[in-house]
Structure formats: C-alpha cells, structure tokens
Amino acid sequence: FLTFNNQTISKKVFIKTNKIKLSGCGIEFLTKITDFKSINCVRIIPGLDQYTIEVIHEIEEVKPLKYNGNLASIDLGVNNLATITSNVKGFRPVIINGRPLKSINQFFNKKLSYYKSKLEKNGTKSSHRTKRLNNKRTNKINDYIHKSSKEIVSILKKNDITKLVIGQNKEW
C-alpha cells in the first residue's frame, strides 16, 4: 500500500474545499475531517476491484461517563442478533434481527458451492469471481453489524444509560 504523510497533503485545497489532495498523484477527495492539524497520514490500499483510502487522524480522547445507576444488558444470539433490556423505568426491550446475516451467509454459501463445483472441473481452487463474492459478503456483514451497533449506541444515549452488560454473567 501507499502511505502519504501530512506534508504531502495540500493545505490550501483542504482549507478552501475541505478536500484532501495528495501531491504527486492528483488524487483528491472530500472528507468530514475539519482540522487539518489532526491528519497524520493517508493510506491507499489496493483491493480486488477497488482501492481503499484510509485517512489516519487524531481525535480528542472521550472521557468515560460516570455511572448514574442506569444500565442495560445485551444478550447476543443468531436469530436475534441482540436483545436489549434495561433497568430504566419505561424502557421497552429491543430486539435487533439477526436473520439478515443468516440470509447473507446462506446466499454466499449457495453461490460459493456452485462456483467451486465449476472450478473443480478445471482443477483450480479459487477465482476472481469467488474472491469478489467473498468481498461482497464481508462488506454486507460489516455494514449490517455497523448499523446495528450504531442503533444500539443511539438507544443507550437516548435513555441516558451509562453501563452496558454484554453476554453471560458468571453469577447467573
């Protein structure tokens, strides 16, 4: 992969347009980062069908909240990815569906077995298509889990919950 330190980023372009422009290669892209000084470096990582651009930057350390007596518990599962309950008065338990993840995996396994059977006839084990299929599956799963975790955090913030218990407790 290619690494560009903060000295190779055009400060003028960043201040005017909030875009990161890498000198020497003509790559320019929009960013949500507002402070130029916080940017450490930019990495360009080649993938199968695309390139991934990572902007490494510093953020302020978030101080942990003081425990206010409000807690939530999450039970992780397969059909129900997460079941959330809390001791907050009026809190309605929330279930985050896990079936879409099962569906993504089922579709992936079905397609992969089809392609593998075709490849075995040719004497090869992998192809560009199977790698692309695997990338697509990984991206879909990461997207769903990220959206689910973001939803959980917003529920916790909305109900002013400062402590979260996940999984099996030894005392239970």
Residue spans for each PLM region:
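Acidic carboxylate diad motif detector
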Residues: 1-47
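Positively charged, helix-rich recognition surfaces that bind polyanionic ligands
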Residues: 38, 46-172
